[in-house]
């Protein structure tokens, strides 16, 4: 698979394919696109020859933009644009995020508004295709004048600014000069504007955000699948998902969520088909399901709408020219701009984190019903498998751990974009997006969320197996589940502890084995996009095409 860069058509799926899937990258052969790239570079060259004043070319930067740069200093000032930002340390940015950042910077430069040589873009592409990842740090960017610090470590590495910039390649950590030589390049000086064009953009925070969105959409898909398992374990009615209800309140996400849940539950033996005329109630319980099921479309719908909006914003940002100044090669104009302000990325990440917190809290509240006999419609206390011993406690500790994770996930959902310092960079960056903080927190939240969902899937498997045993005498839940949820059940069951067993639930006697390896098996499958992901692929594809 090869992703072609033209500055305008990169999708979240493309970014995911390169960042996490290792897909190859190519520069478009479109003559118009290439003409814009070459043309913008020619505009800068002519402006320098004429002695025009251009920010960051013939001046210093930011709050020192009143300082003029002489002709013999033009190259040095571009080196300084990068050199001065090798200024951080701390935790490294994961390779997938570095790859996304390189891809987005290359794509942005392909718009032909940045005034750089095509050779710089070719180097970014060469690094990507070779699997060479500059060592970049999480800290240092406020997402205002772009991601100056993290993008510096990428830009300086592809230029070979100094051997102190390190690159990971084929399991080794090498200096950038060695890596350049391995790839057939030599160090090169930046031309006027090029140093600034490499680090003055939103590629780092938006690259992190793009990877987050892929995981967040996966998580939302899993969450809906988990709810479908829970609904069948709790003897839910399908009436809550009847299209008539949601036609009366036609928010796109609500309508989508109801339709998908209806599809997931169709044919389930424990689902009361009230929409089909079955009005019988179970064991004299409430005439209607509790809110967690009955209001699922109304609760989950805004999450779907919000994630769709965030995904669209990140995808748009990935196809922008976002450095300063920008050049119009058709007219020769240069524009002093603010496209480097990553506010859309910051807001999208703040929103995503908040929505993921709501999503996990909903799941946590449903599990509380399933483990509590007063609310579970006949499930065993704490979903104990073997009640005969009298000492098994089932999933009590697992749910306590999920309580902890749900709280952490919710805490990480607090906004960041509104907490910017007004004094940044000599008061020049007196508004700033904090997009890198927002995106890094979102990645951290997704780490916890995937762990939470692994535990939720284990709970769902145990719940439907307990229900199956109550209803049929067999612990193999395929006997009761809807056709649409059988693949998810099988995938989760195998990832956690092997094939379904008619005689024993996945957690039978507490001392048969620990819960930890079961959760780890599910988490590994989720992280590798294994069988659980494959089982939900149709649902994930539906979410990909959904538009709020």
Curated annotation (Swiss-Prot):
Description of pH dependence: Optimum pH is 9.5 for the ammonia elimination reaction from 3,4-dimethoxy-L-phenylalanine. Optimum pH is 9.0 for the ammonia addition reaction to 3,4-dimethoxy-(E)-cinnamate.
Used in biotech as follows: Is an attractive biocatalyst for the production of enantiopure phenylalanine analogs, such as 3,4-dimethoxy-L-phenylalanine which is a key building block for the anti-Parkinson drug L-DOPA.
Recount the entry's temperature dependence annotation: Is thermostable, showing a high melting temperature of 82 degrees Celsius.
Pathway field of the UniProt record reads: Phenylpropanoid metabolism; trans-cinnamate biosynthesis; trans-cinnamate from L-phenylalanine: step 1/1
Instruction: Please verify whether the record's keywords include Lyase.
Output: yes
The EC number of this protein is: 4.3.1.-
Q: Where does (E)-cinnamate bind?
A: 200, 288, 294, 324, 396, 425, 428
Posttranslational mods: Contains an active site 4-methylidene-imidazol-5-one (MIO), which is formed autocatalytically by cyclization and dehydration of residues Ala-Ser-Gly.
Q: Name one GO molecular function term.
A: ammonia-lyase activity
Q: What are the entry keywords?
A: Lyase, Phenylalanine catabolism, Phenylpropanoid metabolism
Q: How does it assemble?
A: Homotetramer.
Q: What is the role of the protein in this entry?
A: Aromatic ammonia-lyase (AAL) that shows reduced activity to catalyze the non-oxidative ammonia elimination from the canonical AAL substrates L-Phe and L-Tyr, contrasted by its pronounced efficiency towards substrates with electron-donor aromatic substituents such as 3,4-dimethoxy-L-phenylalanine. Is also able to catalyze the reverse reaction in vitro, i.e. the ammonia addition reaction to cinnamate derivatives, producing enantiopure phenylalanine derivatives. Shows no activity with L-His.
Question: What is the protein's name according to its record?
Answer: Aromatic ammonia-lyase
- What organism, scientifically named, is this protein from? Loktanella atrilutea
Gene assigned in the entry: pal
């Amino acid at each position: 698979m090869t992703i072609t860069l033209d500055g305008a058509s990169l999708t979240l799926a493309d970014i995911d394919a390169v960042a996490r899937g290792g897909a190859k990258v190519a520069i478009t052969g479109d003559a118009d696109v290439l003409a814009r790239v070459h043309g913008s570079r020619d505009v800068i060259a002519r402006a320098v020859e004429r002695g025009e004043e251009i920010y960051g070319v013939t001046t210093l930067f930011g709050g020192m933009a009143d300082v003029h740069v002489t002709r013999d200093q033009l190259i040095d000032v571009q080196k300084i644009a990068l050199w001065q930002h090798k200024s951080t340390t701390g935790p490294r940015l994961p390779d997938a995020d570095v790859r996304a950042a390189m891809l987005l910077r290359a794509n942005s430069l392909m718009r032909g508004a940045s005034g750089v040589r095509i050779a710089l873009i070719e180097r970014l592409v060469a690094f990507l295709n070779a699997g060479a990842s500059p060592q970049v740090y999480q800290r240092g960017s406020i997402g205002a004048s772009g991601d100056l610090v993290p993008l510096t470590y990428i830009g300086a590495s592809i230029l070979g600014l100094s051997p102190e910039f390190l690159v990971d390649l084929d399991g080794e950590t090498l200096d950038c000069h060695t890596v350049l030589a391995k790839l057939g390049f030599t160090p090169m000086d930046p031309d006027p504007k090029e140093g600034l064009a490499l680090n003055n953009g939103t590629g780092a925070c938006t690259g992190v955000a793009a990877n987050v969105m892929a995981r967040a959409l996966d998580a939302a898909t899993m969450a809906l699948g988990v709810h479908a398992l829970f609904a069948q374990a709790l003897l839910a009615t399908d009436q809550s998902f009847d299209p008539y209800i949601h036609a009366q309140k036609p928010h796109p996400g609500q309508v989508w969520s109801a339709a998908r849940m209806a599809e997931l539950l169709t044919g389930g033996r424990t689902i009361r088909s009230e929409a089909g005329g079955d009005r019988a109630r179970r064991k004299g319980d409430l005439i209607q399901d509790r809110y967690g099921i009955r209001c699922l479309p109304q609760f989950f719908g805004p999450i779907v709408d919000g994630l769709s909006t965030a995904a669209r914003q990140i995808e748009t940002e990935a196809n922008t020219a976002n450095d300063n100044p920008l050049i119009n090669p058709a007219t020769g104009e240069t524009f002093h701009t603010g496209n480097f302000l990553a506010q859309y990325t910051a807001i999208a990440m703040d929103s995503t984190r908040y929505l993921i917190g709501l999503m996990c809290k909903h799941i946590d509240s449903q599990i509380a019903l399933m483990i509590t006999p007063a609310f579970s419609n006949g499930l065993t206390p704490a979903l104990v498998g073997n009640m005969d011993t009298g000492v098994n406690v089932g999933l009590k500790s697992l749910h306590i751990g999920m309580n902890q994770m749900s709280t952490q996930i919710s805490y990480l959902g607090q906004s960041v974009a509104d907490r910017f310092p007004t004094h940044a960079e000599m008061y020049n960056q007196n508004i700033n997006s904090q997009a890198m903080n927002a995106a890094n927190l979102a990645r951290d939240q997704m780490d916890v969320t995937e762990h939470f969902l692994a535990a939720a899937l284990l709970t769902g498997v145990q719940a439907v197996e307990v229900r199956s045993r109550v209803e049929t005498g067999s612990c193999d839940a395929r006997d009761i589940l809807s056709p649409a949820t059988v693949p998810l059940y099988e995938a989760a069951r195998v990832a956690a502890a092997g094939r379904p067993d008619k005689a024993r639930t996945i957690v039978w006697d507490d001392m048969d084995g620990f819960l930890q390896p079961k959760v780890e098996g599910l988490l590994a499958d989720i992280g590798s996009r294994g069988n659980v992901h494959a089982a939900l692929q149709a649902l994930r594809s539906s979410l990909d095409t959904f538009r709020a």
